[in-house]
């Protein structure tokens, strides 16, 4: 079975527990924290995938490192260790966020711009794209892309809204080529 399918199953199980306990936000924050630690620390990943280190040692280590997370998240980490699936943790976190966003009718947007946007600009973009997408809210993450000449590009899910100067120039060029 592919890692994506397995990750989705774990995410769905966590999502059901979170809904039952009314802790969608808390689980999301904890999963993002754990995901962040895993992706930024290659030594942690190496330690947890080392076959000569016992599962109990790995679990004790996880309990110490992630003492602040809920029992459900910690137990999920233990199960991943037992099933030798700890490497799919980032995918599980991403799948969980998708499920939680769907439940709350929220979307995550990555906004590419030539400079950091102010909070007011982020808010305006979030409001405009919430209306455009039919979502209750949009959470904006700003990424500076110095290759843009001007304007912004917004990525929500697998859709890209290109309001950059480069995008406009490319559309004009296509239009001119089409009319030849």
UniProtKB/Swiss-Prot annotation:
The keyword Nucleus does not apply. PROSITE patterns: ATPASE_DELTA (PS00389). Pfam families: OSCP. Gene3D superfamilies: N-terminal domain of the delta subunit of the F1F0-ATP synthase. It is found in: Cell membrane. SUPFAM superfamilies: N-terminal domain of the delta subunit of the F1F0-ATP synthase (SSF47928). GO terms for molecular function: proton-transporting ATP synthase activity, rotational mechanism. InterPro entries: ATP_synth_OSCP/delta_N_sf (IPR026015), ATPase_OSCP/d_CS (IPR020781), ATPase_OSCP/dsu (IPR000711). GO terms for cellular component: plasma membrane; proton-transporting ATP synthase complex. The keyword S-adenosyl-L-methionine does not apply. It is a peripheral membrane protein. F(1)F(0) ATP synthase produces ATP from ADP in the presence of a proton or sodium gradient. F-type ATPases consist of two structural domains, F(1) containing the extramembraneous catalytic core and F(0) containing the membrane proton channel, linked together by a central stalk and a peripheral stalk. During catalysis, ATP synthesis in the catalytic domain of F(1) is coupled via a rotary mechanism of the central stalk subunits to proton translocation. This protein is part of the stalk that links CF(0) to CF(1). It either transmits conformational changes from CF(0) to CF(1) or is implicated in proton conduction. F-type ATPases have 2 components, F(1) - the catalytic core - and F(0) - the membrane proton channel. F(1) has five subunits: alpha(3), beta(3), gamma(1), delta(1), epsilon(1). F(0) has three main subunits: a(1), b(2) and c(10-14). The alpha and beta chains form an alternating ring which encloses part of the gamma chain. F(1) is attached to F(0) by a central stalk formed by the gamma and epsilon chains, while a peripheral stalk is formed by the delta and b chains. PANTHER family: ATP SYNTHASE DELTA CHAIN. This is ATP synthase subunit delta. It comes from Bacillus mycoides (strain KBAB4) (Bacillus weihenstephanensis).
